[in-house]
């Protein structure tokens, strides 16, 4: 493979969907943002995804149409085999990944994988979760606890406390400069 698979992870509320949407709006001829296939209705949440029923999802999985797939938060997620074609064509591909399933991505893509972890301070994360209004107070507390205890190893860290424009610029800078370094890297704004 000649392209990089950028596996973007981070806690709920860290700004992954906003970052991906901003990347889609810019012109990057050598980079594509992959859509995930999710067993969630099209209008639910903020993510631009392909909505599938569980039956459709399992039919595609049985036909080996997903490069990667996982189950989380009572939903099934998949990334289509098309990403392998894009990578072989030399394109970099950004995927809204899963922190817990980073080992699965590493096993499949090896040195072609660039894991990037969005991090935000606890106060900013709490504020964002409260503003979006999808979780109650208990669910917010659980998400904050999960975010504090789980940080993937060997990821390039990107602080997302600043503006969306700053985060997009730093994300693109990380992709250009860090490549597939094995050691953990940190980028702060």
Curated annotation (Swiss-Prot):
<keyword id="KW-0547">Nucleotide-binding</keyword>
<dbReference type="InterPro" id="IPR008145">
    <property type="entry name" value="GK/Ca_channel_bsu"/>
</dbReference>
<dbReference type="InterPro" id="IPR012699">
    <property type="entry name" value="PhnN"/>
</dbReference>
<dbReference type="GO" id="GO:0005524">
    <property type="term" value="F:ATP binding"/>
</dbReference>
<feature type="binding site">
    <location>
        <begin position="10"/>
        <end position="17"/>
    </location>
    <ligand>
        <name>ATP</name>
    </ligand>
</feature>
<comment type="function">
    <text>Catalyzes the phosphorylation of ribose 1,5-bisphosphate to 5-phospho-D-ribosyl alpha-1-diphosphate (PRPP).</text>
</comment>
<dbReference type="GO" id="GO:0033863">
    <property type="term" value="F:ribose 1,5-bisphosphate phosphokinase activity"/>
</dbReference>
<comment type="pathway">
    <text>Metabolic intermediate biosynthesis; 5-phospho-alpha-D-ribose 1-diphosphate biosynthesis; 5-phospho-alpha-D-ribose 1-diphosphate from D-ribose 5-phosphate (route II): step 3/3.</text>
</comment>
<dbReference type="InterPro" id="IPR027417">
    <property type="entry name" value="P-loop_NTPase"/>
</dbReference>
<keyword id="KW-0067">ATP-binding</keyword>
<dbReference type="GO" id="GO:0019634">
    <property type="term" value="P:organic phosphonate metabolic process"/>
</dbReference>
<dbReference type="GO" id="GO:0006015">
    <property type="term" value="P:5-phosphoribose 1-diphosphate biosynthetic process"/>
</dbReference>
<comment type="similarity">
    <text>Belongs to the ribose 1,5-bisphosphokinase family.</text>
</comment>
<protein>
    <recommendedName>
        <fullName>Ribose 1,5-bisphosphate phosphokinase PhnN</fullName>
        <ecNumber>2.7.4.23</ecNumber>
    </recommendedName>
</protein>
<dbReference type="Pfam" id="PF13238">
    <property type="entry name" value="AAA_18"/>
</dbReference>
<keyword id="KW-0808">Transferase</keyword>
């Amino acid at each position: 493979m000649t392209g990089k698979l950028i596996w973007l992870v981070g806690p709920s509320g860290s700004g992954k969907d906003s970052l991906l949407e901003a990347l889609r709006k810019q012109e990057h001829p050598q980079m594509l943002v992959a859509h995930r296939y999710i067993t969630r209705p099209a209008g639910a949440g903020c993510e631009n995804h392909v909505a599938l029923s569980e039956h459709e999802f399992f039919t595609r999985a049985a036909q080996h149409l997903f490069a990667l797939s996982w189950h989380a938060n009572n939903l099934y997620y998949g990334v289509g085999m098309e990403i392998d074609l894009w990578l072989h064509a030399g394109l970099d591909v950004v995927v809204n990944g899963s922190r817990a399933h980073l080992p699965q991505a590493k096993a499949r893509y090896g040195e072609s994988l660039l894991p990037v972890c969005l991090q935000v301070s606890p106060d900013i994360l709490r504020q964002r979760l409260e503003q979006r209004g999808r979780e109650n107070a208990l669910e917010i507390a659980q998400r904050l606890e999960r975010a504090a205890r789980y940080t993937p190893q060997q990821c390039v860290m990107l602080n997302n406390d600043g503006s969306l424009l700053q985060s997009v610029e730093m994300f693109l800078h990380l992709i250009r400069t860090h490549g597939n370094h094995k050691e953990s890297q940190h980028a702060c704004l």
